[in-house]
Amino acid sequence: LPGFWKDADRQEYFHLYEVTAKAVKEVDERLLVGGPAICGVDDVSWLQDFLDYVKEKKLPLDFVSRHHYTSYVPDRVGHYGYIDLHDPDDAFSGLEKSREIVDSYEEFAGKDIHITEYNTSYIPNAPVHDTCYNAAYVAHMLSRLGDCHTSYSYWTFGDVFEELGVPFTPFHGGFGLVANGCIPKPTFWTFAFFKKLKEKKIHRSEDSLITKQKDGSYYGVIWNPDNDGKGEKKEVTYTIHLPENYERQEYCNLVKIVDEEHGNPLKVWHD
């Protein structure tokens, strides 16, 4: 907290919420207020203390907010921060704990939780952001974030980040889905693919999500991140089984791929 406000502490932050929430509601009761925007540092203690404060002071709380980043402390070398990511399943344990804490309060049980920022790394100069690995890892996140959260906002759409100014090079590990110059990075296509997943979910696993549309067509996303960091090639196979009574006619299986050779502008830039 002192990184944002001089001599700030937890109680001062809660007091800031108190005066802000009251001011907002005085203007219009219909405006929603919430917090505390925890961000992966001592989350349990922060969230419990915040809810205790709101309960004791009888403050308005329409929703709970938090951030979600899944990297360890970066190894800073030159302009960049190189990071390792948590195991995808382990990364969700903190989110599930937040839901559990909120629901443990009678006053707040069932409150909406909004993830107002999420990404792999929390720094705007992590090379992982520009990679296919990031795209595959985020696909796993997208497949599950909606289970316990009302909304979740990827941080950020573009690489021009106001805190650090205009990027010094097209690919510098920025947060964005698109690099400077509106170049779509691999993770951009993760969102483009997930946009197609509508109507009825018929399958979800640790590496895939399949939906059936009203017109009878199927859309799916399959991801294959190299979570062990060894860079070894891992094959992905899938099989489509048609029922015996399926109408005999022509069918089309359209596949779009993002990997080191496809949809990867970073490699083109390096080459």
Task: Specify the residue positions occupied by each region the protein language model found.
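Carbohydrate-binding surface patches
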Residues: D207-N264
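Histidine- and/or cysteine-centered catalytic micro-motif in compact active-site loops
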Residues: Y69, Y118, F157-G158, G181, ...
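Noncatalytic carbohydrate-binding groove/subsite architecture in carbohydrate-active enzymes
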Residues: D9-T150, P170
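Conserved residues at the C-terminal ends of beta-strands
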Residues: L1, H67, Y152-W155
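Alpha-helix capping/termination and helix-coil
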Residues: V102, E106, H149, K195-I202, ...
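Catalytic cores of secreted or luminal carbohydrate-active enzymes
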Residues: L142, T156, F168-S205
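Flexible loop/turn segments at secondary-structure boundaries
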Residues: P2, V41-D43, S71-P74, T120-P124, ...
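Short, surface-exposed loop/helix-turn segments at secondary-structure junctions
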Residues: W269-D271
